[in-house]
């Protein structure tokens, strides 16, 4: 029997009485986001809206973005990816379970040095899927656009991982699963974490280094395997 979404007590700043909100809304207030389902327009719009709000509320505190998703729409994934690049704050992306297809694309789009995986998580790279069906004319037009988007995504993967675009194209032609070590070597992530407390240390390192003009990727990459 499903237990539903748990509710927890939360007191809105300035209010004297606590109210009960679902656990995800409570975590949003702590700048923690979850992608735990198929990525469609509705889910993407919710995530984008929360990121815009958190960035406008405080552009000095980072966002932690947990991912356990089979992926989804190319347009939705590109929207979330673009927002991560657009906002001022750092976005730490964390794979737990599985980040497949466009979910792995979002994982790779996190702030450099802050793209993480738990030890038993997996990422999966493959060719993003497009829609089909309808009249022949529109199917041809859609096919051209799908090919354009796939090529765009391949180039962005290459940019985020440092892999040659030719290798990205080949690897996207089949389901390509990777454990943390392989994902790090490939460039999809920067670091494997074994305990959630490591996030605090990582955030402190990044915050300290930003005061000197940037994140020391070499130092962060040496932490873990």
From Swiss-Prot:
Which keywords label this protein?
A: Chloroplast, Hydrolase, Plastid, Protease, Serine protease
The broad enzyme category this protein falls into is: hydrolase
Cellular location(s): Plastid, Chloroplast stroma
Q: What is its EC number?
A: 3.4.21.92
Superkingdom: Eukaryota
Enzyme active site: 101 (nucleophile), 126
For the keyword Protease, the answer is yes
**What are its GO biological-process terms?**
protein quality control for misfolded or incompletely synthesized proteins
* InterPro entries named among the record's database cross-references: ClpP, ClpP/crotonase-like_dom_sf, ClpP/TepA, ClpP_His_AS, ClpP_Ser_AS
Q: Give the GO molecular function terms.
A: ATP-dependent peptidase activity; ATPase binding; serine-type endopeptidase activity
- Statement: the UniProt record of this protein carries the keyword Plastid: yes
One of this protein's Pfam families, by short name?
CLP_protease
Q: Which reaction does it catalyse?
A: Hydrolysis of proteins to small peptides in the presence of ATP and magnesium. alpha-casein is the usual test substrate. In the absence of ATP, only oligopeptides shorter than five residues are hydrolyzed (such as succinyl-Leu-Tyr-|-NHMec, and Leu-Tyr-Leu-|-Tyr-Trp, in which cleavage of the -Tyr-|-Leu- and -Tyr-|-Trp bonds also occurs)
What's any one GO cellular component for it?
A: chloroplast stroma
The family line of this record is: Belongs to the peptidase S14 family.
Report the function annotation for this chain: Cleaves peptides in various proteins in a process that requires ATP hydrolysis. Has a chymotrypsin-like activity. Plays a major role in the degradation of misfolded proteins.
What is its quaternary makeup?
Component of the chloroplastic Clp protease core complex.
Q: What is this protein called?
A: ATP-dependent Clp protease proteolytic subunit
Q: Which organism is it from?
A: Chlorokybus atmophyticus (Soil alga)
Q: Which gene encodes it?
A: clpP
